């Protein structure tokens, strides 16, 4: 069922086709529109820009017209800048962000979702099987591992808003909290990393009136851990209590 929803029929070519593609996804119930301005680490097409300006703007404008947020997968610098100019709400991965681009993002209010924990998935697969990837893909993965965290070290001090994300599917489900450790390792104070996963993530997704902070009238989404995450953020990997929308899921 999902294959038909994410298959080649959802490719778009040209601005008008991109508008149609967005409307099609919204008609299917999409809350967020995500598209790629560059190739991916796991693809054989490289990380250069794969979209032109009018296509990106058409995607963003149409999504925003329907009140949807827009996330953009972008690794290469030109693709990141293209997404920011087009008005994207967030850049996912942003592996080559430099100071100029970070300043663009801060000025535009574009969030950065670093997805640092993707490297854990790569490292674990390679440890189990050094030949898990074709040579061309392995070279891109080695590069990605080597530059992990560098964009965050540039973007965060320059005032870019950081939101939490893991690129689920590359990172294993249930391993979300790995990202906290890496955000802190590469320069964010523990409280700011926690805010990235709560306050900032809710604001980015447009659900900050419902969740993201513990306030009267908002959803009771609460976790508890044995320890102080401000002293050791890794304790967030072992939750002792989970409440979602007021219902206890784990613990008592």
Segment roles from a protein language model:
Residues 1-68, 101-103, 108-134:
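Divalent-metal coordination cores built from histidine and acidic residues
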Residues 33-35, 70-72, 91-92, 112-114, ...:
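Hydrophobic faces of well-ordered beta-strands that scaffold small-molecule active sites
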Residues 85-90, 106-111, 131-132, 159-161, ...:
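Glycine-enriched alpha-helix->loop->beta-strand junction motifs that scaffold or abut catalytic
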Residues 52-58, 71-84:
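N-terminal active-site wall of soluble small-molecule enzyme domains
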Residues 1, 39-43, 74-81, 96-99, ...:
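Active-site environment of divalent metal-dependent phosphoester hydrolases
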Residues 65-69, 133-136, 142-229:
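His/Asp/Glu-enriched, well-ordered alpha-helical/loop segment
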């Amino acid at each position: 069922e999902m294959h038909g929803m994410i298959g080649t029929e959802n490719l778009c070519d040209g601005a008008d086709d991109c508008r149609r593609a967005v409307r099609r996804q919204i008609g299917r119930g999409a809350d967020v529109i995500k598209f790629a301005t560059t190739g991916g680490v796991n693809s054989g097409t490289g990380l250069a820009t794969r979209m032109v300006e009018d296509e990106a703007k058409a995607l963003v404008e149409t999504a925003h017209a329907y009140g949807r947020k827009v996330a953009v997968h972008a690794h290469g610098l030109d693709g990141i800048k293209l997404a920011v100019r087009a008005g994207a709400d967030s850049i996912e991965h942003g592996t080559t962000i430099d100071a100029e681009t970070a300043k663009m993002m801060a000025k535009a209010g574009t969030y950065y979702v670093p997805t640092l924990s993707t490297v854990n998935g790569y490292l674990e697969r390679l440890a189990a099987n050094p030949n898990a990837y074709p040579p061309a893909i392995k070279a891109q993965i080695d590069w990605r591992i080597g530059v992990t965290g560098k964009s965050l070290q540039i973007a965060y001090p320059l005032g870019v808003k950081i939101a939490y994300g893991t690129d689920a599917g590359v990172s294993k489900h249930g391993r979300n909290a790995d990202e906290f450790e890496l955000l802190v390792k590469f320069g964010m104070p523990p409280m700011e990393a926690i805010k990235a996963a709560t306050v900032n993530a809710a604001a980015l997704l447009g659900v900050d009136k419902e969740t993201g902070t513990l306030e009267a009238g908002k959803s009771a989404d609460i976790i508890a851990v044995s320890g102080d995450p401000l002293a050791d953020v890794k304790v967030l990997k072992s939750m002792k209590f989970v409440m979602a929308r007021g219902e206890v899921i784990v613990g008592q």
